[in-house]
């Protein structure tokens, strides 16, 4: 069996109470960014969901450092993908005895950090 050098670490956050469209705005913002820069940007971001994305990114960094022994200073966010999770359906009463459905969306977030070679 051939041993492959694994130079990436992943972290995931599931069932986050935000729509995938809103979460993808923040995820797309940190893609291909150095992790130190991404943490600074997420800390000062006005988006509510940036706090959850920052927690997931810190988990990926910790996985890279503790499980694989990668250098934190050379880590880059290579993937930040967003997926749809469950949809909570609620009913809102309206006029004349009618009712409308309200969909409350949930999302999944997957972050991959990779150690880049110095050129």
Curated annotation (Swiss-Prot):
Gene Ontology BP term (one): translation
Keywords of this entry: Ribonucleoprotein, Ribosomal protein, RNA-binding, rRNA-binding
SUPFAM superfamilies assigned: Ribosomal protein L22
A single cellular component GO annotation: cytosolic large ribosomal subunit
Domain of life: Bacteria
Entry GO MF terms: rRNA binding; structural constituent of ribosome
Function, in words: This protein binds specifically to 23S rRNA; its binding is stimulated by other ribosomal proteins, e.g. L4, L17, and L20. It is important during the early stages of 50S assembly. It makes multiple contacts with different domains of the 23S rRNA in the assembled 50S subunit and ribosome.
PANTHER family reported for this sequence: CHLOROPLAST 50S RIBOSOMAL PROTEIN L22-RELATED, LARGE RIBOSOMAL SUBUNIT PROTEIN UL22M
Assembly with partners or alone: Part of the 50S ribosomal subunit.
Record-linked HAMAP family: Ribosomal_uL22_B
Protein name: Large ribosomal subunit protein uL22
Provenance organism: Rickettsia canadensis (strain McKiel)
Gene expressing this chain: rplV
